[in-house]
Amino acid sequence: MAENSADTVSPLVVKVGGSLAETGRMPAALSLIAATRVPVVVVPGGGPFADSIRALQPTMKFGEALAHRLAMLAMHQMAELIVVQNDRFSVVQSLAEISDAVRDGKVPVWAPLRMIAGDAAVPAGWMATS
């Protein structure tokens, strides 16, 4: 997916933050994304689900590693909400699924947990997740 050649085009990665849901602008943004013919991968923010994790972390006293994992689950929840907005959207959890979705004319919406949980190259903290 990351390689470029005359036969392949790397998709544009678009972060759809939770603030779009809170301001009511998400449907319009998703309509624009769904209408594009440029290959796109949507990375959802965790939105209100991630906000809940942030609020619970100090009172429930869980560490950054668990907060990171829960934030990825929050991103998955937002992915599920995004895909019901348009038939072109499809939840994906691997590079192969991303490639398949793009090939099939779908807009992949990435749920990151399966790909990056436990990956030492990805910092387990709020800077890396929603």
Give each language-model segment a name.
Residues M1-S130:
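Nucleotide/pyrophosphate-binding catalytic subdomain
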